[in-house]
UniProtKB/Swiss-Prot annotation:
Molecular function per GO: rRNA binding; structural constituent of ribosome; tRNA binding
A Pfam match: Ribosomal_L5_C
Gene Ontology biological process terms in this record: translation
Protein name (record): Large ribosomal subunit protein uL5
Organism in which the protein naturally occurs: Synechococcus sp. (strain WH7803)
GO cellular component: ribonucleoprotein complex; ribosome
Length: 179
């Protein structure tokens, strides 16, 4: 059963009851997932940008947008319009497919994994997770990468509070660390 189907058939009714909501439309749901990668020092290197774009495209299955510097910062040696990272926004079917792969395949492959931090909510029910290495995703082959790079994954939900967001992600199978 796909994550979207499981959400509709089991998670939504359970959250409706657990959070004591009166309407199905009040139940929190995932709106979008944003995968972002800043290049840092590698911003000077065009090859690393290309590798980053290709890796994110493989992981997400969607075209990647190159993010550019809004203004020049001499201390970081960047000029306005220079590529400084890349990002992908996933919605709909691709979003659910990515979340399913993240929760069931990628996260368990992290070394010494004890669960993700339950404190990384932003106060409005959205969750952000930092991944240190891209090789946890099965789409990336270890032999073909030139450097280990991380990424930020933000899960945007309609939850009003962190507790609602946590309940939603826990039901979806997100392995939260027990403190």
């Amino acid at each position: 059963m796909s994550l979207k189907q499981r959400y509709r058939e089991t998670i939504q009714p359970k959250l409706l009851k657990d959070l004591s909501l009166s309407n199905v439309h009040e139940v929190p749901k995932v709106v979008k997932v944003t995968v972002n990668r800043g290049l840092g020092e590698a911003a000077q290197n065009a090859k690393s940008l290309e590798a980053s774009v290709n890796e994110l495209a493989q992981i997400t299955g969607q075209k990647v947008v190159v993010t550019r510097a809004k203004k020049a910062i001499a201390g970081f040696k960047i000029r306005q319009g220079m590529p400084i990272g890349c990002a992908v926004t996933l919605r709909g079917e691709r979003m659910y497919a990515f979340l399913e792969r993240l929760i069931n395949l990628a996260l368990p492959r992290i070394r010494d994994f004890r669960g993700v931090s339950p404190k990384s909510f932003d106060g409005r029910g959205n969750y952000t997770l930092g991944v240190r290495e891209q090789i946890i995703f099965p789409e990336i082959s270890f032999d073909k990468i030139d450097a280990i790079r991380g990424m930020d994954i933000t899960i945007v939900t309609t939850a009003r509070t962190d507790e609602e967001g946590r309940a939603l992600l826990r039901e979806m199978g997100m392995p939260f660390r027990s403190n």
